[in-house]
Amino acid sequence: MSISLKALKKSPWVFHVNTGACNNCDIEILDCLTPRFDVERFGVVLVGSVRHADVLLISGPLTQNCLPRLRRVYDAAPKPIKVVAFGACGCKCGIFRDAYNTVGPIDKFIPVDAYIPGCPPKPETIISGIVKVLNSL
């Protein structure tokens, strides 16, 4: 295992992308950062720039307006990057599957390494999913 992959397992930096969600999943991400759940005990840090990220955490159904933005974000991310789709909408478009402006699930456009289902997923589930992705390295 290379040195960079070992470092990634110990302190992953996560960048969140919302592709048209209702905001419930975003609130659960914030819950992960509170002292009750303390995702930082695993070395996970939420970053403000995709250029610093090791993991992309994507929520929401992919809309026509967000598709070009998601592609730009994915292309700007340093490789290798792990992609996690979370929430019912992030995994398979949820209740917005047949909406006029939904183009399809995220894995139709970029490769996804893990799925965290739920509407919204609980903070424990989000943390467990991220840790499992990192343990798969």
Predicted segments — roles?
Residues 1-137:
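Iron-sulfur-associated redox domains of electron-transfer enzymes in respiratory
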